[in-house]
Amino acid sequence: MTENTVSEIERMVVTRVFDAPRELVWKAWTDPKYVMQWWGPKGFTAPVCQMDFRVGGKLLLCMKTPDGYEGWNAVEYHEIVLHEKIVSSMYFSDSEGNRVEPAQLGIEHEAIDGAHDVTIFEDLGNGQTKLTHIGNEPMESAKNSGQMEGWNQILDKVAAVVAELAQAK
């Protein structure tokens, strides 16, 4: 894994505006039954989602590819501001949540040393919410590796979940 420092590199950022109040977007992002519906790019599923959503808590996810490969991710929560912000660290793991280096999985992943993932939920008024996800990888690397495309596909899936929640409200 290549490491760079936080201040010297432009980080991956994806944003999306949802036609729903911030509380619904937050719910879609933080409730495991909804996370299972959107985790992973288009065509991927998330058959396992164990979430302890609190500062110091952990999220363990299995992301299953269309051809059946199961990859695991873990997330540790460092800061949670209700309906506003989540600061976390995401990493590749085994099914028990133990950290696995990307190279062990045959994955090239460039992380910025000391960078956390930050997800911001901004109330735009008029029932709209802007979600901004700042990743721990350099923008250029995220574009080249497909991470950027994957996160945009994830946000498409989040939009579908949010639309369902808004309709049910």
What are the language-model segments listed below?
Residues 1-45:
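Hydrophobic ligand-binding cavity/cleft-lining segments
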Residues 6-8, 53, 67-71, 109-113, ...:
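A generic structural micro-feature
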Residues 9-15, 22, 58, 72, ...:
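Intrinsic-disorder/low-complexity, polar/charged segments enriched in Ser/Thr/Lys/Arg/Asp/Glu/Gln
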Residues 13, 33-72, 76:
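Short beta-edge strand/loop motif at the mouth of beta-sheet-based domains
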Residues 16, 48-49, 73-79, 114-123:
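Hydrophobic/aromatic beta-strand elements that line small-molecule binding cavities or substrate pockets
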Residues 25, 35, 59, 77, ...:
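Hydrophobic pocket/interface hotspot
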Residues 48, 161-169:
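Short, highly charged C-terminal tails/helix-capping segments
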Residues 84-91, 97-153:
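Beta-strand/loop substructures that line and gate deep hydrophobic ligand-binding cavities in soluble
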